[in-house]
Every structure is written in structure tokens, then in C-alpha cells.
């Protein structure tokens, strides 16, 4: 059970990191 929770947190962290990086690059291109 804890392994599934850790996996879910890892996927959520990766998704947040990639989305933040994408938005950051997008904002840099807009400037």
C-alpha cells in the first residue's frame, strides 16, 4: 500500500516539475 502511495507521489512530482519547466520555457519565449 505504501509503495503505491510513494509511486503516486513520485508521478505527481514529476508531472508538476515537467509542467513547471514547460511553463517557464513558454514564459521565457514570450518575453
Swiss-Prot record:
UniProt xrefs under InterPro entries: Cyt_b6/f_cplx_su6
Signal peptide as annotated in the record: none
Sample GO molecular function, one term: electron transporter, transferring electrons within cytochrome b6/f complex of photosystem II activity
Primary site of residence: plastid
Subcellular location: Plastid, Chloroplast thylakoid membrane
Tagged with keyword Transcription: no
Swiss-Prot/TrEMBL keywords: Chloroplast, Electron transport, Membrane, Photosynthesis, Plastid, Thylakoid, Transmembrane, Transmembrane helix, Transport
Regions that span the bilayer: 3-23
One GO CC term, this protein: cytochrome b6f complex
GO biological process, one term: photosynthesis
A Pfam cross-reference name: PetL
Membrane topology qualifier: Single-pass membrane protein
Subunit structure: The 4 large subunits of the cytochrome b6-f complex are cytochrome b6, subunit IV (17 kDa polypeptide, PetD), cytochrome f and the Rieske protein, while the 4 small subunits are PetG, PetL, PetM and PetN. The complex functions as a dimer.
Record family assignment: Belongs to the PetL family.
Function noted in UniProt: Component of the cytochrome b6-f complex, which mediates electron transfer between photosystem II (PSII) and photosystem I (PSI), cyclic electron flow around PSI, and state transitions. PetL is important for photoautotrophic growth as well as for electron transfer efficiency and stability of the cytochrome b6-f complex.
Protein name stated in the entry: Cytochrome b6-f complex subunit 6
Originating organism: Trieres chinensis (Marine centric diatom)
Lineage: Eukaryota, Sar, Stramenopiles, Ochrophyta, Bacillariophyta
Amino acid at each position: 500500500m505504501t509503495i503505491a502511495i510513494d509511486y503516486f507521489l513520485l508521478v505527481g512530482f514529476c508531472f508538476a516539475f515537467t509542467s513547471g519547466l514547460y511553463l517557464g520555457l513558454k514564459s521565457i519565449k514570450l518575453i
